[in-house]
Amino acid sequence: VDAAELASLLTEMYVAKGMSEHQFPLTAPVYIRAKAVQTTAYGQEIEGTSITSNVITLNKVYLLFSLPPVKTPEKLYLVGSFNKWSWDNALEMIPVNGSPNIFWHLVYLDGEGNSAGVKFNSDKAWNGNEAGFEKITINPASDNAADIINANGNIGSSKAGWYLMIVECTVVGRDIKYNVTFNKPNVYLQGVCTAAGGWDLIPDNLFSVPATADGEFVSPAIGNAVSGGPSGSDPGVRICVKIPNADWWKAEFIVYDKKIAYRGNGGDQTPRVAGAVGQKVYLNFTKETGEIK
């Protein structure tokens, strides 16, 4: 028996009984039985040849905590009625710059019908780790906390529409906990390209919000022409959402080649993208597409 494998198995047994990491190391008896069986030349068990030993007692086994540390997920993916519950085209949530345990995305939530709502997971799979309504804690400080309902185990809304969904992941013991904020779906045109030409998040810079899951968010008209350019100091079209207690640029994004490109944990998004006076930005967050025209 591989010693590391046995130590891991024993640790899992004690954790399942309610013990926590700080209670290790410990000394405990271990009871083992050995099994022998004849096999064919191809490794197949020969029926009727199995034999099991008496119980072997190891009276004092010194056991260190032998499970790997639990970490917050590096990625989160969203599925739901908006994409027919397909992991193949799941939305990847965006990490807040400098806060790799916090993710966000604009998402359309509904609450009616057996397939309503959304779930999220750190893998693109139905593997038992997906989080629905019962696996999240709704942040009471959310703009729209009262709208969120249990939609057949999924995360749904009593008022179908768009939400800025922010998931904060923390480790408690051996479990990952999800504190989820559901804010207004505010998307801002930002910076020099706006009519005001400033960096404050003001109502005049808000995108309009569509009524459907496949609709487009539309910006106000660009008020100042921006030339774009290869460096971060060049003026360009910039867009963001606002994450509580974070600077605006920590949740910014832009449109490249008709696709939404998120900054995430990256640096300045270059090259900057040009925009002419009167043009608007059109964004589809279900398809992750965009256009400036």
Task: Report the location of each language-model feature.
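Insoluble glucan recognition modules
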Residues: V1-K293
